């Protein structure tokens, strides 16, 4: 299965109505044309992939290697550069533009972004644990509790207070509601990770849902 992908910016959420009057909450992703900066092949690089650049960056903020890399594609330095593997290399050439019309309404996609950061939080907020008794006699209210009858160290992965959010998350099997080529906008059903104006990666679903028996 070949993969399609594009880089974009999360704008926010809104809602659209179908012809039947059904309300659908959607996330608006602005995806201005991405530029193909490099086409990697098995012979030269050991794997097949394309490298896309998104969002122009001032030359004064880029070094010489960055400027030389994008000069091969006859474009300006890019703020974000990502690779997409398992693509059909014959469909891409260096300096080509990838637009939102690479997707169509009804396509199933995976969306990757960095979640909002919430700073240092306790167990109740961070992991959804329960409080202790709040009566006057109790001395246990919002503490983590016992770590168990284990050796004198903390095992990795235990739920303890710490930093919450600001992690890369992928939400799978979201549906493209509309691809607006004129405005360079994708409408994706549901919510996607990240704050408004943050970078998101939209690509073909890795494990799309199986069709139901009635749809076969």
Swiss-Prot record:
Segments for region (Disordered):
119-143
Q: Which domain of life is it from?
A: Bacteria
Per the record, the GO terms for biological process are: translation
Its Gene Ontology cellular component terms are: cytosolic large ribosomal subunit
Question: Which one of the record's GO molecular function terms can you name?
Answer: structural constituent of ribosome
UniProt keywords, alphabetically: Ribonucleoprotein, Ribosomal protein, RNA-binding, rRNA-binding
InterPro entries per UniProt: Ribosomal_uL3 (IPR000597), Ribosomal_uL3_bac/org-type (IPR019927), Transl_B-barrel_sf (IPR009000)
What function does the entry list? One of the primary rRNA binding proteins, it binds directly near the 3'-end of the 23S rRNA, where it nucleates assembly of the 50S subunit.
Q: How does it assemble?
A: Part of the 50S ribosomal subunit. Forms a cluster with proteins L14 and L19.
Protein family per UniProt: Belongs to the universal ribosomal protein uL3 family.
- Output this protein's name: Large ribosomal subunit protein uL3
Q: In which organism is this protein found?
A: Levilactobacillus brevis (strain ATCC 367 / BCRC 12310 / CIP 105137 / JCM 1170 / LMG 11437 / NCIMB 947 / NCTC 947)
- Please spell out the taxonomic lineage of the organism that makes this protein: Bacteria, Bacillati, Bacillota, Bacilli, Lactobacillales
